[in-house]
Amino acid sequence: MPVIIWINGGFGAGKTTLAEELHRRLPDAVVYDPEDVGLMLWKWIRPNGDFQHLPSWRELVVATALSLRKHHAETLIVPMSLIRDAYRAEILDGLADADEEVLHVFLEADAGVLRERLNARVTHPGREWDQAAREFGMTGLDEMVAAAARQPGGTLLLRSDRLTPAELADEVLARVGLRQVHADDKRMRQARSLERAQPARSSAPSPSWPPTSPGP
């Protein structure tokens, strides 16, 4: 099942929870969090408030995904918000241009639900990082809710405020299985086309070598 499952959605939509549930069912998959790429960049350059604005982040996110797929895992699970349309298109198109199968999932939830989840979230107890992360998430809450209507065709839209993590995972894996059938059919059609394009082999016997000398 070679595929990249990109889990998009607003902060508090349940991306990490769904990624964990999918990984539980697909233990050979790799969970790849592009946030780590941003934190790595911030070790070398001055933090800019949102690493998604960095062209290097967007380029490295694609390059890292391709390398992980090539060397380490057939299936990647990527929980990462891509709310800005241009950034989403740049990254997903970059993966598609490399002939990667990508299932783009967008988790929807009402603004009130997202707000409650963000207020209840504690990642680093007692640290200012948690408060800063909550404030960052709250700032773009309306934009994150509105983004659901702007997702490209082929996106799997799921309501994370109405479905359990297990039900969400069921929907994702059902779509992955369907895509895999289509991918297998496509490969079979391509193989048949190549066979038809090959020149037909002659049925005439091959001449012997060395040639037989003529008799007396």
Q: Which sequence ranges carry the predicted segments?
A:
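Walker A (P-loop) ATP-phosphate-binding motif of ABC ATPase nucleotide-binding domains
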Residues: 4
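Hydrophobic anchor at the beta1->P-loop junction of P-loop NTPases
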Residues: 7
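The conserved Walker
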Residues: 11
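Conserved glycine(s) of the Walker
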Residues: 14
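Conserved substrate/cofactor phosphate-moiety recognition/catalytic segment
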Residues: 17-66
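Glycine-rich phosphate-binding loop used to anchor ATP phosphates in small-molecule kinases
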Residues: 53-106
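Small-molecule kinase domains that catalyze NTP-dependent phosphoryl transfer to phosphate-bearing small molecules
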Residues: 120-171, 180-209, 216
